Swiss-Prot record:
The lineage of its organism: Bacteria, Pseudomonadati, Pseudomonadota, Betaproteobacteria, Burkholderiales. Belongs to the NrdR family. A zinc finger (unnamed) spans 3-34. This is Transcriptional repressor NrdR. The gene is nrdR. It holds the Pfam family ATP-cone. The keyword Repressor applies. It comes from the Bacteria. GO terms for molecular function: ATP binding; DNA binding; zinc ion binding.
Length: 155
């Protein structure tokens, strides 16, 4: 393993254990040249389906892009980074369970909207307004009416 600090290729493994969530092997290493320590993780390589965009082009799935779009919708909302990561993991599990080589971006968008609806209704509306290309206020009103009908009143 190449040292991230000096680039030397010889490192010594000091400790090996399973990560807390059990999906990776965590290794603590020491560079034999500069003596600095660092941690590496080994994970199973998963093959996600390619995403087919509206214009027909295909792009590789990236967790970072999904996370960025969700974080944008959740900006300044009271939702923890952990809750976002858990939602992304649920989306990824659904994508893998499909067993497809390609899926339309619209299907990913619907999965994101389901998770955002559970996390934060304002974030859901933000995402839906862009994803569904809302043109006027009536489309926002339709979503708000949908929430009002599905939410029990307090009191």
């Amino acid at each position: 393993m190449k040292c991230p600090f000096c680039g030397h290729s010889n490192t010594q493994v000091l400790d090996t254990r399973m990560s807390e969530d059990g999906d990776a092997v965590r290794r603590r290493r020491r560079c034999e040249a500069c003596d600095r320590r660092f941690t590496t993780y080994e994970r199973i390589e998963l093959f996600f389906p390619a995403i087919v965009k509206k214009n027909g082009s295909r792009v590789d799935y990236t967790r970072a892009k999904l996370k960025d779009s969700m974080r944008l919708a959740l900006r300044k909302r009271p939702v923890s980074a952990e809750a976002i990561d858990e939602a992304i993991t649920r989306i990824e599990e659904k994508l893998l369970a499909l067993g497809e080589k390609e899926i339309p971006s619209s299907q990913v968008g619907e999965l994101v909207m389901r998770e955002l609806r559970k996390l934060d209704k304002i974030a859901y509306i933000r995402f839906a307004s862009v994803y569904r290309s809302f043109e006027d206020v009536s489309e926002f009103r339709d979503v708000l009416d949908e929430f009002a009908a599905s939410t029990p009143r307090k009191g």
